[in-house]
């Protein structure tokens, strides 16, 4: 990993009505890291992730977000240069974000739209390079046999793997995954997390993933950032996140819901 962060968040705040979703959050993400964002519901995890991609504007003020050294947003306004960052950032949502009536192949091939004319892509006139990259990505995530099927006929796990494949066709250098396993059964969830971990370790992709499942955060991610009421309350190695801190983050009920063998 290099010392220069690929993502930099400085004093980012976001208010919805009277609720402070983010409260002066600062964070650097280095190239090749796999980071879990954890915290109770409403702690600001998804708001932070969407703000990093410029999908959510932060409040006016001193807050600023950069990606690859270029501006994403600052002082309550998304930069007019944000597209330069977005073409290298793959965003994976909880609800899969696939077009149900299109085949899985077409959904994944749409990742190339930043490099080919939009009309060509919308008509499905994919150049050979895109076709080859799409099949390679589908094979990489283990769903190539479903390439011709409509996305809405696939299971949630298959669709989520398709969303990851689309990020590969996009040639993303960073994957932002917002609760990617929240809607999946345990087997599918583990498979998705294993794929993200493999892309991080084998391909050097930077991954930032929001998770409700603390055990997945500790198992698959080297670094954990915890938010509580919009504030960053932990940022460090997963191996050092102990029971006492987790109870502080989630409350006393954490003892009752956490899996057997939790950190001491």
UniProtKB/Swiss-Prot annotation:
Gene: phnC
Pfam families on file: ABC_tran
Compartment(s): Cell inner membrane
Predominant location: membrane
Keywords of the record: ATP-binding, Cell inner membrane, Cell membrane, Membrane, Nucleotide-binding, Phosphonate transport, Translocase, Transport
Biological function: Part of the ABC transporter complex PhnCDE involved in phosphonates import. Responsible for energy coupling to the transport system.
Residues annotated to bind ATP: 39-46
A GO CC annotation given for this chain: plasma membrane
Subunit note: The complex is composed of two ATP-binding proteins (PhnC), two transmembrane proteins (PhnE) and a solute-binding protein (PhnD).
The protein, known as: Phosphonates import ATP-binding protein PhnC
Organism of provenance: Caulobacter vibrioides (strain ATCC 19089 / CIP 103742 / CB 15)
PROSITE patterns linked: ABC_TRANSPORTER_2 (PS50893), PHNC (PS51249)
EC number(s) stated in the UniProt entry for this protein: 7.3.2.2
Family of this protein: Belongs to the ABC transporter superfamily. Phosphonates importer (TC 3.A.1.9.1) family.
């Amino acid at each position: 990993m290099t010392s220069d962060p690929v993502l930099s968040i400085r004093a980012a705040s976001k208010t919805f009505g009277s609720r402070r979703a983010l409260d002066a959050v600062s964070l650097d993400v280095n190239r090749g890291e796999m980071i879990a964002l954890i915290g109770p519901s409403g702690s600001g995890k998804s708001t932070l992730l969407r703000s990093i991609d410029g999908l959510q504007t932060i409040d006016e003020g001193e807050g600023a977000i950069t990606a690859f050294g270029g501006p994403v947003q600052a002082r309550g306004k998304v930069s007019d240069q944000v597209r330069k960052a977005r073409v290298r950032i793959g965003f994976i949502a909880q609800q899969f974000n696939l077009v149900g009536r299109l085949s899985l192949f077409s959904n994944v091939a749409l990742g190339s739209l930043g490099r080919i004319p939009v009309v060509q892509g919308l008509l499905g006139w994919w150049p050979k390079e895109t076709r080859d990259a799409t099949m390679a990505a589908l094979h990489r995530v283990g769903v190539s046999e479903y390439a011709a099927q409509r996305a809405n006929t696939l299971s949630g796990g298959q669709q989520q793997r398709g969303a990851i494949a689309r990020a590969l066709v996009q040639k993303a250098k960073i994957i932002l995954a917002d609760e990617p396993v929240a809607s999946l059964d345990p087997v599918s969830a583990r498979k998705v997390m294993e794929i993200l971990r493999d892309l991080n370790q084998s391909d050097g992709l930077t991954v930032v993933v929001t998770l409700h499942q603390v055990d997945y955060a500790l198992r698959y991610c080297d670094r954990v950032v915890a938010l509580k009421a919009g504030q960053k309350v932990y940022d460090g190695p997963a191996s050092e996140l102990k029971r006492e801190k987790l109870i502080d983050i989630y409350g006393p009920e954490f003892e009752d819901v956490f899996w057997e063998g939790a950190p001491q």
